[in-house]
Structures are given as structure tokens and as C-alpha cells.
UniProtKB/Swiss-Prot annotation:
GO terms for biological process: carbohydrate transport. SMART domains: AAA. InterPro entries: AAA+_ATPase (IPR003593), ABC_transporter-like_ATP-bd (IPR003439), ABC_transporter-like_CS (IPR017871), ABC_transpr_MalK-like (IPR015855), ABC_transpr_MalK/UgpC-like (IPR047641), Mo/tungstate-bd_C_term_dom (IPR008995), NA-bd_OB-fold (IPR012340), OB_MalK-like (IPR040582). This is Uncharacterized ABC transporter ATP-binding protein YcjV. Pfam families: ABC_tran, OB_MalK, TOBE. Disulfide bonds: none annotated. CDD domains: ABC_MalK_N (cd03301). Keywords: ATP-binding, Nucleotide-binding, Transport. The keyword Oxidoreductase does not apply. One of its GO terms (molecular function) is ABC-type transporter activity. The keyword Electron transport does not apply. Residues 4-235 form the ABC transporter domain.
Length: 360
């Protein structure tokens, strides 16, 4: 169990590339924190600084109140799971899981107890005598997790552990890691570029871009209240739709659209002096409905209709704007078809067109 405090953490390489910029985060005991962002955003570098595998260029890392900047990795009471399983091919599953404990000269009976306990949790009991080559990708990843679990560390770090698995296995392992967190009741920090993993697993998500933290919050918070256009577009699949326009009276207008803004949102826009200035409206695909209501109805033409099973993803053209609409599968939709869509303006978001920061 551990609490972490990252205070003004910086990472600058010798070539003056600034990879992580003024990273601040307080992590409570037993939290499941996910760092998410595109490639090169600094998420893995931050994780490696926590692990002691990268030197911290500036700021302080505290674990349970103790400054860890100069403490070697092996003394930080941290266990790490990497993207590649890093298993010894000539060793059995048991020996792979026990290897670190043997290096620490832990008593044989303690090693046996921990390995069997971890194997029971991970469903590996029947595979303990097998070698990695005889296992599936998901089973090998469980072995890598087991090797970390047996250390009984205060903090578990995971660097894109599921990226080598196929889609079905990723879904399965997501659930298994979440269950594992509940069973171990320990602090976990997980790195991924996959926003679905972040949304489904985290107690809090840290969204990064270009080495800078964009937003920290619970999955529902960052989805429903994104801090800026980057977060709004990165979290959610398909991504949020964005339309540039202006506010005229109680309407959001473009050259081809005119949508009525709810009073509560209009009041915020007025206090932020956003009237008659360039502004961006964002609306998620599930908040555009392929049916007519009393107002905010627009004619759209379907360019692509993707059936995913329970629903359609409709890629439409609306007055010169490309918009994605999520629709139920009760009706059939086809490319080239004209439909009427309704904007649920109570669910829309408005962003400053210049700063891209959320207004409401």
C-alpha cells in the first residue's frame, strides 16, 4: 500500500528535448490511476521516472512521504509489468514467477506460498510446470502479472501490458486486471494509448499531450466535462464532433446550421463574453439522434453506415460538416440515404475557438 506525490516533475534529455513538463499529481493509497495519451506524450517516461528507470530532471517524487528521486529502483518497493512479457523461455511458469524472490534470497517456503497464491488468483495453477512457449499470449501476460504480484510491492506499475494481445484477449485481460486490483487492494499506475482501457479500468485518468497534463479526473468526469478540445476529442469512440461557428442571440450558427442553445448554457456563454466571437461546439455521436423533434432538426446525408451489431455508426454530411451519429440497429441505414437528425443541445459543449479551452 502506498501514497505517491509527484511535484513539478520534469524530464529533459541531454539534447534539450523537454519530454515531461511540470507534472503534478497526488495519488491516494489503493487508487487505480491510468496515464493515457498519444505516442510521445510522456506517459511512459513519467512511469519510468516513478519506477527509478529514468532520472528525474526536476521536481520531487514522494512515496509515503519519503523523497525517492535518488533512491535506486530496487529499493522503491515497486513492481513493474512491461509491454513485452520478458519471461525466461527456458524456465517454467513457477520459476519465472519465483525468480525475483530467489534473487532476494527469500525462504523457499515463502516463495512457494506466494507463487501458489498468485497462480490461484490468476488461474495459472495447472500451468506452473509449463514453459512460456507452451502458453497463449494471455497466459504469458498473466505470468508476467504473477511475477509482479509475488513481490507484494506497495505500488504496481504497468506499461501498456495489453498492447501485444488481440482484441478479444485485451477485453478479457482488462477485466482480469480490474479484478486483480480489487483483490490486491493496492496502488496501481497503468499506462496506455487506448482510451477504452483508460475509461473501463481507472478510478482516475491522467490525460497527457506533449508532456503536459491536460486533465485529471474520474472516467465519467473527463467524458462528460472535458477540460479542452484535445480531451474531448481523445476520450470517447467515435470521437466528439466539432463544429466551428458563432453565437447569435440564442442560436449557434454557421453558414448552413442554426441550432437553439439551452438557457443555462447560453447564460454561461454570456458571462464568458463568448457572444459574436468564433466558438466551437462539440457534440458526441450518441447525442445526435436520427429522428425529428420540435427543434434543432437538420437534414443529413449518410456517406457510410457501419453496423457494429447492436448499433450503427453513421458517417454523415450535414451542411458541409462531417458528423458521426450513433444510432440503434432497429432501423436499417444505407450510404446515400437522406435522414433527419436531431441535436440534443442540452448535451453539447462549447469551446473557445482560439484557446480550445472548455467554456461550458
Amino acid at each position: 500500500m502506498a501514497q505517491l506525490s509527484l511535484q513539478h516533475i520534469q524530464k529533459i534529455y541531454d539534447n534539450q528535448v523537454h519530454v515531461v513538463k511540470d507534472f503534478n499529481l497526488e495519488i491516494a493509497d489503493k487508487e487505480f490511476i491510468v496515464f493515457v495519451g498519444p505516442s510521445g506524450c510522456g506517459k511512459s517516461t513519467t512511469l519510468r521516472m516513478i519506477a527509478g528507470l529514468e532520472e528525474i530532471s526536476g521536481g520531487d517524487l514522494l512515496i509515503d512521504g519519503k523523497r525517492m528521486n535518488d533512491v535506486p529502483a530496487k529499493a522503491r518497493n515497486i513492481a513493474m509489468v512491461f509491454q513485452n512479457y520478458a519471461l525466461y523461455p527456458h524456465m517454467t511458469v513457477y520459476d519465472n514467477m519465483a525468480f525475483g524472490l530467489k534473487m532476494q534470497k527469500i525462504a523457499r517456503e515463502v516463495i512457494d506460498e506466494r507463487v501458489n497464491w498468485a497462480a490461484q488468483i490468476l488461474g495459472l495453477r495447472e500451468y506452473l510446470k509449463r514453459k512460456p512457449g507452451a502458453l497463449s499470449g494471455g497466459q504469458r501476460q498473466r505470468v508476467a502479472l504473477g511475477r509482479a504480484i509475488v513481490r507484494e510491492a506497495g505500488v504496481f506499475l504497468m506499461d501498456e501490458p495489453l498492447s501485444n494481445l488481440d482484441a478479444k484477449l485485451r477485453v478479457q485481460m482488462r477485466a482480469e486486471i480490474s479484478k486483480l486490483h480489487q483483490k490486491l487492494n493496492t496502488t496501481m499506475i497503468y499506462v496506455t494509448h487506448d482510451q477504452t482501457e483508460a475509461m473501463t479500468m481507472a478510478t482516475r485518468i491522467v490525460i497527457m499531450k506533449d508532456g503536459i497534463v491536460q486533465q485529471v479526473g474520474a472516467p465519467k468526469t473527463v467524458y462528460n466535462q472535458p477540460a479542452n478540445m484535445f480531451v474531448a476529442g481523445f476520450i470517447g469512440s467515435p470521437a466528439m464532433n466539432f463544429i466551428r461557428g458563432t453565437i447569435d442571440g440564442d442560436k449557434f450558427v454557421t453558414e448552413t446550421l442554426k441550432l437553439t442553445i439551452p438557457e443555462e448554457k447560453l447564460a454561461v456563454l454570456k458571462t464568458q463574453e463568448s457572444l459574436h466571437k468564433p466558438i466551437v461546439m462539440g457534440i458526441r455521436p450518441e447525442d445526435i439522434h436520427p429522428d425529428a423533434q420540435e427543434e434543432n432538426n437538420i437534414s443529413a446525408k449518410i456517406s457510410v453506415a457501419e453496423l457494429t451489431g447492436a448499433e450503427f455508426m453513421l458517417y454523415t454530411t450535414v451542411g458541409g460538416h462531417e458528423l458521426v451519429v450513433r444510432a440503434g440497429a432497429l432501423n436499417d441505414y444505407h450510404a446515400g440515404e437522406n435522414i433527419t437528425i436531431h441535436f440534443d443541445m442540452t448535451k453539447c459543449h462549447f469551446f473557445d475557438a482560439e484557446t480550445e479551452i472548455a467554456i461550458c
